[in-house]
Regions:
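Short acidic-glycine motifs
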Residues: 1, 45-49, 61-65, 98-100, ...
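Short acidic/polar hinge/loop motifs at secondary-structure boundaries
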Residues: 12-40, 59-61
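A mature extracytoplasmic/lumenal domain signature
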Residues: 10-12, 62, 105, 143
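Solvent-exposed loop segments that connect transmembrane elements
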Residues: 151-174
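Transmembrane beta-strand segments of Gram-negative outer membrane beta-barrel proteins
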Residues: 33-38, 53-55, 59-77, 99-101
């Protein structure tokens, strides 16, 4: 809500127009953006100004990821048909460097509704140089481009006339 603030590595990422965080901007990157700290209400936060609702900081610092590989492939019959994710983190090496990379893809030629497709990619890269326990320098890059088509709400009468509860009023001839 507009009473909440979402930060990524201590930088507020709420949309300045709507006042809300756009979760589609990190779509598919669940593993890369799962490390969070949430403060409820007006309590002091170590990462930004408190909000009436809550303040959440998403930590994508490479040194804070557990070293190793994590991957998954899943099939669904919903908005998308196939999803693949992979994340790899090096941990902090003897020179004080840590790296992390995450990629995901979601695809459907046609989702559960006729005329709906889904094509999304997510990519996150992070590097961090740890100088000592109190000082480090980090760079995080992420993107999540997406194309999709879906249905829209309609009246029960339309579903009954089409004799199909998956009727998509956005698909077909539009006169």
């Amino acid at each position: 809500s507009r009473y909440d603030a979402t930060y990524i590595n201590g930088i507020e990422m709420n949309d300045p127009t709507r006042g809300r965080f756009n979760y589609w901007s990190i779509g598919g990157l669940n593993r890369a953006f799962r490390n969070k700290t949430t403060i409820l209400g007006m309590d002091a936060t170590p990462f930004g100004f408190a909000r009436i609702g809550s303040s959440t900081n998403i930590n994508t610092l490479a040194a804070d990821f557990a070293p190793g590989f994590n991957g998954s492939i899943s099939y669904s019959n919903g908005a998308y048909m196939l999803r693949a994710m992979a994340t790899y983190a090096t941990g902090v090496n003897k020179h004080g460097w840590a790296f992390v990379g995450s990629i995901s893809g979601r695809y459907a030629k046609e989702g559960i509704m006729p005329g709906s497709f889904y094509n999304a990619l997510g990519l996150m890269l992070g590097a961090q140089k740890v100088f000592n326990p109190q000082h480090s320098l980090a760079l995080t890059f992420y993107m999540a481009p997406m194309q999709s088509a879906g249905g829209s709400p309609t009246f029960k009468e339309c579903y009954e006339l089409a004799d199909n509860y998956l009727y998509n009023p956005n698909w077909g001839w539009q006169d």
